């Protein structure tokens, strides 16, 4: 896709129309006086510099390939994605291993992997640590296995297909890479990256007082925010953010997981000129948060006026760059999906919801990282849902969290989605909050994570066996998958489809 400042993202097929309009405008400019021609040239040079800068800062947001949003049909054969279309995974040994087998005419299937350990389970499947046979060096993956019969009987086949299609689109350092997917007579299988650091929920449990420091929480929240921003650029509403779904890679950086609840919709990303604001930091006092849902004063849209009469010089913009914004607001899902403690009010009230639910869950997420618990948890699930709807946001009396962190959480946990931070301007608005001051968004992958996982000793999982499993062993593996998928039910995980 082509990125044009001040305009929507446009495909190569339609970009020439905009170029034609630009050429017509330039022709008119040639009829003006020389002084205006010189001024126009200065403005064009400035614009080119800004385009170059924003392109650099947008590297983590949008891949340089077209996104195919069309639905894909099931393929009974193995499918692996060409790593040339995944720029951020260059030099990945997992791709080398997969492509090496593919170059020899091998179509990956379940028999090409040695199952080492069950890592966890979700609502529609279980995840296993697996080793790719015949790979040199030895290569490990996480394989999500979903039972076909169970998906059909529970009316969740579409969710499994949606997850696979979404994973096939993703190309981002904080999102999963789908190396291959295939199916057998009984199972759908997704082959992804194995994250040796576990998830943020388990890591939080190991921290003093079971909560992260503010610096650590800021680091993890920053990377999650970039992942959500990228998803929204693709027209994907995540809908399942919680620490359990934020995995920690072996380098300490994060990866979002589980996309079976995600919602896809159309989206129109745009570049909008921003102006540097000044004045107050927009801190809200606790009384205001209790009395109602207020939007922090630090967050007001900063739009570029399109009138030519009001053009400003370069100095007037104070070096600010265009903002890339994309909020898929043209969707109103009626699905009741998610985890009780993270459900947004509009989901519970069945009012229809869009991308703003991700910003609500982002607020709950930050609150839990800093306090070790979610803000609306009740004695039971019904009490929790009631608290989300009817109780104001409160912070613990002993809370040592800074006022800027509280202010961000208050803005995110506004019960009316239209008044919530980022409802119109998305992650761009959140990035400018004082809580994230000092974060270098373009270079965050180079930052030192607050926690580095211990190296995994895979030898304790590897069992001595032949390269080719006999039929009896294959049947044993199939039964193991059956039992694991049948037991994968989470009582705190609810999914009700109204339509």
UniProtKB/Swiss-Prot annotation:
<keyword id="KW-0418">Kinase</keyword>
<dbReference type="GO" id="GO:0080147">
    <property type="term" value="P:root hair cell development"/>
</dbReference>
<keyword id="KW-0808">Transferase</keyword>
<feature type="compositionally biased region" description="Low complexity">
    <location>
        <begin position="63"/>
        <end position="85"/>
    </location>
</feature>
<feature type="binding site">
    <location>
        <begin position="119"/>
        <end position="127"/>
    </location>
    <ligand>
        <name>ATP</name>
    </ligand>
</feature>
<comment type="subunit">
    <text>Interacts with PDPK1/PDK1.</text>
</comment>
<dbReference type="GO" id="GO:0016301">
    <property type="term" value="F:kinase activity"/>
</dbReference>
<keyword id="KW-0067">ATP-binding</keyword>
<comment type="function">
    <text>Involved in root hair growth and morphogenesis.</text>
</comment>
<keyword id="KW-0547">Nucleotide-binding</keyword>
<dbReference type="GO" id="GO:0004674">
    <property type="term" value="F:protein serine/threonine kinase activity"/>
</dbReference>
<feature type="active site" description="Proton acceptor">
    <location>
        <position position="240"/>
    </location>
</feature>
<feature type="domain" description="Protein kinase">
    <location>
        <begin position="113"/>
        <end position="436"/>
    </location>
</feature>
<protein>
    <recommendedName>
        <fullName>Serine/threonine-protein kinase RHS3</fullName>
        <ecNumber>2.7.11.1</ecNumber>
    </recommendedName>
</protein>
<dbReference type="InterPro" id="IPR008271">
    <property type="entry name" value="Ser/Thr_kinase_AS"/>
</dbReference>
<feature type="compositionally biased region" description="Basic and acidic residues">
    <location>
        <begin position="39"/>
        <end position="55"/>
    </location>
</feature>
<dbReference type="GO" id="GO:0106310">
    <property type="term" value="F:protein serine kinase activity"/>
</dbReference>
<dbReference type="Pfam" id="PF00069">
    <property type="entry name" value="Pkinase"/>
</dbReference>
<feature type="binding site">
    <location>
        <position position="144"/>
    </location>
    <ligand>
        <name>ATP</name>
    </ligand>
</feature>
<keyword id="KW-0723">Serine/threonine-protein kinase</keyword>
<dbReference type="InterPro" id="IPR000719">
    <property type="entry name" value="Prot_kinase_dom"/>
</dbReference>
<feature type="domain" description="AGC-kinase C-terminal">
    <location>
        <begin position="437"/>
        <end position="499"/>
    </location>
</feature>
<comment type="similarity">
    <text>Belongs to the protein kinase superfamily. AGC Ser/Thr protein kinase family.</text>
</comment>
<dbReference type="GO" id="GO:0005524">
    <property type="term" value="F:ATP binding"/>
</dbReference>
<dbReference type="InterPro" id="IPR011009">
    <property type="entry name" value="Kinase-like_dom_sf"/>
</dbReference>
<feature type="region of interest" description="Disordered">
    <location>
        <begin position="1"/>
        <end position="92"/>
    </location>
</feature>
């Amino acid at each position: 896709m082509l990125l044009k400042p001040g305009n929507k993202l446009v495909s190569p097929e339609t970009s020439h129309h905009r170029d034609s309009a630009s050429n017509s405008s330039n022709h008119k400019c040639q009829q003006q006086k020389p002084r205006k021609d010189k001024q126009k040239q200065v403005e064009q040079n400035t614009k080119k510099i800004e385009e170059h800068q924003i392109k650099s800062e947008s590297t983590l947001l949008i891949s340089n390939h077209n996104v195919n949003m069309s639905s894909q049909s099931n393929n009974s054969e193995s499918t692996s994605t060409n790593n040339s279309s995944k720029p951020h995974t260059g030099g990945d040994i997992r791709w080398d291993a997969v492509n090496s087998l593919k170059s020899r005419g091998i179509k990956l299937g379940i028999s090409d992997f040695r199952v080492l350990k069950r890592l966890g389970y979700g609502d529609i499947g279980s995840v296993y640590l697996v080793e790719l046979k015949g790979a040199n060096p030895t290569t490990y993956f996480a394989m999500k296995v979903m039972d076909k019969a169970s998906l059909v009987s529970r009316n969740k086949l579409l969710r499994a297909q949606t997850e696979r299609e979404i994973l096939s689109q993703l190309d981002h350092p904080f999102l999963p890479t789908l190396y291959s997917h295939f199916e057998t007579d009984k199972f759908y299988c997704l082959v992804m990256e194995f994250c040796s650091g576990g998830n943020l929920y388990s890591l939080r449990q190991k921290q003093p007082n079971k909560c992260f420091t503010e610096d650590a929480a800021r680091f993890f929240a920053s990377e999650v925010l970039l992942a959500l921003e990228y998803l929204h650029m693709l027209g994907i509403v995540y809908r399942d953010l919680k620490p359990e779904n934020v995995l920690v890679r072996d380098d300490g950086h994060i990866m979002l997981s589980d996309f079976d609840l995600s919602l896809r919709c159309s989206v129109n990303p745009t570049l909008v000129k921003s102006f540097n604001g000044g004045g107050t930091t927009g801190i809200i006092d606790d009384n205001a948060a209790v009395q109602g849902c207020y939007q922090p004063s630090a967050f007001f849209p900063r739009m570029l006026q399109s009138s030519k009469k009001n053009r400003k010089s370069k100095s007037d913009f104070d070096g600010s760059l265009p903002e890339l914004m994309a909020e898929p607001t043209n969707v109103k899902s009626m699905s009741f999906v998610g985890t009780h403690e993270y459900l947004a009010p509009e989901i519970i009230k069945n009012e229809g919801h869009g991308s703003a639910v991700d910003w609500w869950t982002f607020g709950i997420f930050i609150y839990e990282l800093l306090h070790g618990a979610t803000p609306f948890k009740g004695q039971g699930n019904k009490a929790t849902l009631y608290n989300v709807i009817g109780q104001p946001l409160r912070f613990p009396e002993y809370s040592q969290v800074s006022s800027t962190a509280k202010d961000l959480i208050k803005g995110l946990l506004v019960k009316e989605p239209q008044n919530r931070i980022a409802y119109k301007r998305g992650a761009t608005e959140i990035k400018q909050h004082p809580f994230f001051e000092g974060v270098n968004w373009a270079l965050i992958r180079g930052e030192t994570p607050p926690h580095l996982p211990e190296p995994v000793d895979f030898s304790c999982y590897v069992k001595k066996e032949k390269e080719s499993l006999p039929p009896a062993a294959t049947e044993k593996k199939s039964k193991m998958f059956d039992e694991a998928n049948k037991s994968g039910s989470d009582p705190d995980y609810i999914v009700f489809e109204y339509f």
